[in-house]
């Protein structure tokens, strides 16, 4: 199994640069350097101007896309790729469910390393099929010809912004015909044509144009309901646990959700969620100490635990000093959309991607962010990137996992920066890899501080 996944990864490394040079500008799913936030900003950029004309929306979803991809079409698209036979074997390998083997004559294995790339290969050309035309192609592509629709796709979810309902109907008809040879159809229950004044949900955000002409992007009502429900379930399950357990469980959920939705108009929703969390932990505290008065409970669990915030109602542990983060502590940022057809695989764009990384501020603590910027995103001991990842997390849960991984993989430690072992020895706080820290303790690294390599931006 491990060898097979490694072979799939090797195949992706061989295929991806070729297809990245071909893929359409507004395809954002499962591609290096692109993600959900780019897709949301692409829609916002198209429809946010007061004189915007593309206000009719085809909101479409493909029915069980991974299960029905046509194998012949995929293999034909790969042309003379040397590992084409390997791809065919993966596609027809079959699945084992409940101990029973079922052969696969269509579809791509979900969870496979190569499956997302296969999906993008199968759906390449969708913009052209919908009638989208650009003034320029390649890296600078992005400005569409007047009168044509704009299609934004993330994997098998897509939004087509059109000038009229008739144009939206035409786009749907064209795409229905184009998808048929690929074995795909629209999900009738999840596909609709609507006007932006009614709002549309996409990738967890609600995008709506209001009567005053403003277009606002907010967390969708369904996303808010889900996080409220999850927080309630988690706190209920923690009855009988101590405050440290509550904080350890809720902090990743809060920071992960806030990190994903920080690019929208989310401040009021963040504040409302903080109120919801406060009520949950207050109820937890009252149930934990049912025989204690309210004043005792609030004095024990609430206070100014975060020294950098003037907030006396932070939930925390008097024993450890750990405290519960708040949604509103995550600043709202404006995401900068990736430019046209730019790809990290293009060596001519190395400076562009380095500049883009430098301008990116990950949702980490102020001290961590300051150290990252001072160190140009690199570990001073091994000179490797500290926050390297193939792509930005694409959901609140992925952000939870990413932030947890960063906490596990990095350490803030005092490092000798000058004159080790001399009277002039200087020590400064640095962010280093956890494994570099272990090696330093074992004598694997010298005590002398190693200067960083040429700055290439934050990972």
Model-assigned labels for residue ranges:
Residues 384-387, 424-452:
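Short Cys/His-centered divalent metal-binding micro-motifs
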Residues 22-199, 390, 444:
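Conserved polymerase palm-domain catalytic core
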Residues 234-295:
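Right-hand nucleic-acid polymerase module
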Residues 88-103, 248-251, 346-356, 408-410:
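Active-site-adjacent bridging/hinge elements
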Residues 13-29, 449-456:
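Charged boundary/loop elements
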Residues 274-370, 374, 378:
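Extended C-terminal regions of large enzymes
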Residues 92, 182-257:
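A conserved non-catalytic segment of reverse transcriptases
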Residues 386-432:
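Histidine-centered nuclease catalytic patch
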């Amino acid at each position: 199994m491990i060898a097979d996944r490694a072979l799939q990864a090797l195949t992706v490394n061989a295929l991806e640069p070729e297809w990245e040079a071909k893929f359409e500008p507004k395809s954002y799913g499962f591609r290096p350097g692109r993600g959900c936030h780019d897709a949301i900003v692409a829609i916002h950029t198209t429809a946010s101007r007061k004189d915007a004309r593309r206000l009719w929306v085809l909101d479409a979803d493909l029915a069980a896309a991974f299960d029905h991809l046509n194998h012949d079409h995929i293999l034909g698209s790969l042309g003379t790729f040397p590992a084409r036979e390997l791809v065919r074997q993966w596609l027809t390998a079959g699945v084992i469910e409940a101990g029973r083997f079922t052969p696969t004559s269509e579809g791509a294995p979900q969870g496979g390393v190569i499956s997302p790339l296969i999906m993008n290969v199968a759906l390449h050309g969708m913009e052209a099929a919908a009638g989208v035309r650009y003034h320029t192609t390649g890296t600078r592509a992005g400005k569409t010809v007047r009168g044509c629709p704009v299609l934004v796709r993330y994997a098998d979810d897509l939004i087509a912004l059109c000038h009229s309902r008739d144009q939206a109907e035409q786009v749907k008809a064209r795409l229905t015909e184009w998808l048929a040879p690929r074995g795909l159809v629209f999900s009738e229950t999840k596909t609709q044509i609507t006007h932006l004044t009614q709002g549309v949900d996409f990738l967890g955000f609600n995008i709506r144009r209001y009567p005053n002409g403003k277009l606002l992007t907010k967390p969708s009502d369904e996303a808010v309901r889900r996080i409220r429900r999850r927080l309630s379930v988690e706190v209920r399950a923690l009855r009988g646990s101590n405050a440290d357990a509550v904080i350890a469980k809720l902090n990743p959920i809060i920071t992960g959700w806030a990190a994903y939705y920080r690019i929208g108009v989310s401040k009021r929703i963040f504040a409302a969620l903080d109120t919801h969390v406060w009520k949950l932990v207050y109820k937890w505290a009252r149930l934990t100490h049912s025989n204690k008065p309210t004043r005792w409970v609030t004095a024990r669990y609430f206070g100014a635990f975060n020294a950098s915030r003037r907030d006396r109602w932070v939930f925390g542990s008097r024993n450890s000093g750990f405290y519960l983060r708040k949604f509103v502590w995550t600043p709202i940022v404006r995401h900068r959309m990736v430019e046209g057809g730019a790809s990290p695989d293009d060596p001519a764009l190395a400076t562009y991607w380095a500049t883009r990384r430098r301008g990116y501020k990950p949702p980490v603590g102020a001290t961590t962010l300051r150290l990252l910027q001072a160190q140009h995103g690199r570990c001073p001991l091994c000179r490797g990137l500290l926050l390297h990842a193939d792509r930005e997390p694409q959901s609140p849960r992925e952000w939870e996992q990413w932030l947890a991984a960063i906490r596990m993989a990095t350490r803030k430690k005092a490092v000798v920066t000058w004159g080790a072992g001399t009277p002039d020895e200087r020590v400064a706080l640095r962010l280093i890899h956890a494994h570099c820290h272990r090696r330093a303790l074992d004598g694997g690294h010298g005590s002398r501080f190693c200067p960083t390599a040429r700055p290439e931006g934050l990972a």
